[in-house]
Regions:
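Short connector loops at helix/strand junctions that flank enzyme active sites
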Residues: 18-22, 58, 90
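Short Gly/Pro-enriched loop/turn and capping motifs at secondary-structure junctions
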Residues: 30-32, 69, 88
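Context-gated lysine
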Residues: 33, 37-40, 52-53, 61, ...
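An N-terminal amphipathic alpha-helical segment
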Residues: 7-53
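Short, hydrophobic/π-rich interface segment
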Residues: 47-78, 82
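Short, small-residue-biased leader/transition segments that mark boundaries at the very start
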Residues: 1-6
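C-terminal edge-of-domain segments
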Residues: 76-103
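Intrinsically disordered, low-complexity boundary segments flanking structured domains
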Residues: 9-15, 68, 81-84
């Protein structure tokens, strides 16, 4: 799952307990096979973006919950977040986590 992928890519790094985190989630959906060539091109050019489920808030919850006790101790450390949905020929989810510096 996502936790295992994170552990491999981050070499097991866990953010400190007092960290304030910024999480950016990029969800790439498969282009529907029924899409015309013109529509597919518009989807891949980001002129058309996914408006189907899951909703952005559910994506954020699923991703952040799955990183509890893996990337951070609790997702309450996330103080800023963004979820963006796109189409791609390689469906996937990319997650970027940054620690916000104090002061």
């Amino acid at each position: 799952g996502l936790g295992d992928v994170y552990k491999r890519q981050a070499h097991g790094y866990m953010f400190p307990d007092d960290a304030m985190l910024d999480v950016r989630i990029f969800a790439f959906y498969e282009v529907p096979k029924s899409a015309s060539k013109k529509k597919k091109a518009a989807m891949l050019a980001q002129d058309i973006r996914p408006t189907k489920k899951p909703d952005f808030d559910n994506i954020g919850k699923i991703i952040c919950d799955s990183l509890n006790l893996v990337a951070y101790h609790d997702d309450s450390a996330v103080v800023d977040a963004q979820v963006r949905k796109f189409y791609s020929e390689q469906p996937r989810v990319e997650v970027v986590i940054k620690q916000i510096q104090k002061g």
